[in-house]
């Protein structure tokens, strides 16, 4: 059984809702899952998991949230080489540039993206919920 961490930061609850759907998808596929906020996770926990789903909404000028999530993620970057990961997040404006930039960073760090990233415009709709569950299953 694989062990998955679903790590997220959420300001309005949209990315948190996505995180819970990712966890459900991974559990349904047989994985053991821990759902953690960015402040509960760090580089020291990376080795305890077979795969990690990272979730963060677009903030400011299409950037990762910079007070909790981005510092935690930066600390984890050294452990991304060969690690199976997936990315998800919500946004209220723009076209997903923050996600494309984030994916490129992860690839440069040597991470293995298990599936396409999932984006939701504001609250996740039925399609985004299904995509989040599929993302979780892809990590399991």
Regions found by a protein language model. Give the residues of each.
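FMN-binding flavodoxin-like domain, especially the glycine-rich phosphate-binding loop
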Residues: 2-4, 14-17, 21-38, 42-44, ...
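Aromatic-flanked redox-active Cys/Sec active sites in thiol-based oxidoreductases
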Residues: 8-12
